[in-house]
Amino acid sequence: MILQRLFRFSSIIRSAVSVHFRRNIGVTAVAFNKELDPVQKLFVDKIREYKSKRQTSGGPVDTGPEYQQELEKELFKLKQMFGKADMNTFPTFKFEDPKFEVIEKPPA
């Protein structure tokens, strides 16, 4: 009786594990497939090209002097609006504890 339950339980586990592995193998087969269709290949190549350009320039890619001027102008506006604070740091907040008055409870 116990042996039958053990065999039944092991067959259930075996089927669940096989389904799990079959599903994961199907996903990894697609992930490791290096043969891409031409559109995917162009897309991936453009992303890699953009990444390398961004790393070499250290900032926005394919921008002209007008972009830099606009960026400077907008940062200047923000500094004027928010008290000339450094826009690259998180502001520090200073909260003061409220002062409460002690009120005597009248005798009942």
From Swiss-Prot:
Gene3D superfamilies, per the entry: Mitochondrial ATP synthase-coupling factor 6
Molecular function GO labels: proton transmembrane transporter activity
Keywords: Acetylation, CF(0), Hydrogen ion transport, Ion transport, Membrane, Mitochondrion, Mitochondrion inner membrane, Transit peptide, Transport
Spans through the membrane: none
Keyword Nuclease: no
Gene Ontology cellular-component annotations: mitochondrial inner membrane; proton-transporting ATP synthase complex
Entry-annotated residues carrying N6-acetyllysine: 41, 46, 79, 84, 94, 99, 105
Subcellular location: Mitochondrion; Mitochondrion inner membrane
Residues of the transit peptide: 1-32
GO BP annotations, alphabetical order: proton motive force-driven ATP synthesis
Modification N6-succinyllysine occurs at: 84, 94, 99
Source organism, top-level taxon: Eukaryota
Assembly: Component of the ATP synthase complex composed at least of ATP5F1A/subunit alpha, ATP5F1B/subunit beta, ATP5MC1/subunit c (homooctomer), MT-ATP6/subunit a, MT-ATP8/subunit 8, ATP5ME/subunit e, ATP5MF/subunit f, ATP5MG/subunit g, ATP5MK/subunit k, ATP5MJ/subunit j, ATP5F1C/subunit gamma, ATP5F1D/subunit delta, ATP5F1E/subunit epsilon, ATP5PF/subunit F6, ATP5PB/subunit b, ATP5PD/subunit d, ATP5PO/subunit OSCP.
Record's function text: Subunit F6, of the mitochondrial membrane ATP synthase complex (F(1)F(0) ATP synthase or Complex V) that produces ATP from ADP in the presence of a proton gradient across the membrane which is generated by electron transport complexes of the respiratory chain. ATP synthase complex consist of a soluble F(1) head domain - the catalytic core - and a membrane F(1) domain - the membrane proton channel. These two domains are linked by a central stalk rotating inside the F(1) region and a stationary peripheral stalk.
Family label: Belongs to the eukaryotic ATPase subunit F6 family.
Name of the protein: ATP synthase peripheral stalk subunit F6, mitochondrial
Upper taxonomic lineage: Eukaryota, Metazoa, Chordata, Craniata, Vertebrata
Gene: ATP5PF
